[in-house]
Design a protein with these regions (language model features):
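Acidic, metal/ion-coordinating pockets
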Residues: 1-5, 21
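Metallo-beta-lactamase
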Residues: 12-90, 94
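Soluble metallo-hydrolase cores and metallopeptidase-like ectodomains found primarily
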Residues: 4-13
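Accessory terminal helices/loops
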Residues: 8, 63-68, 76-139
Length: 139
């Protein structure tokens, strides 16, 4: 917990899935797992268990019942608040199904683009698909 001008700011989550919780404002700030308006970065979550940990982190954010949520990754005009958290959960669930339904990164990328045609960061989608499908190593 940090203190800033008599306000507590809690660092929540684990490892790379941390976010800041400001209890007095009921606000989640900079939650790495929360994205909106873009394809989620999947290169850091190559295994199903990794993606399930992200969903668990998102569910822990929802359990706080925040009034304000500022996504860590988003485009201008994209939904914020619980809409962004729910979007991220739905995207991860769709991605998991698409991973099982496709043979390679190209198929995975195309299927996700078909399901989410308006999202930005297609290059991130394509790179992550290569890592998830074992066609590329990511540090």
């Amino acid at each position: 917990t940090l203190k800033l001008e008599n306000e507590s700011i809690e660092i929540k989550g684990k490892k790379e899935l941390t976010y800041l919780w400001v209890p007095s404002a009921k606000a989640v700030v900079g939650g790495i797992p929360v994205s909106s308006g873009i394809h989620l970065w999947m290169a850091d979550t190559p295994k199903t268990k990794d993606r399930m940990e992200v969903i668990q982190s998102l569910e822990s954010i929802k359990a706080l019942q925040p009034k304000i949520i500022v996504p860590a990754h988003m485009v201008e005009g994209a939904p914020q608040g619980l809409d962004a958290v729910n979007f991220s959960i739905n995207y991860l669930n769709s991605y998991e199904k698409a991973t099982k339904a496709t043979k390679n990164a190209t198929e995975l990328s195309k299927l996700m683009q078909k399901q989410y045609p308006t999202l930005q960061s297609v290059d991130s989608l394509e790179l992550g698909a290569k890592v998830v499908k074992g066609e590329m190593q990511w540090p």
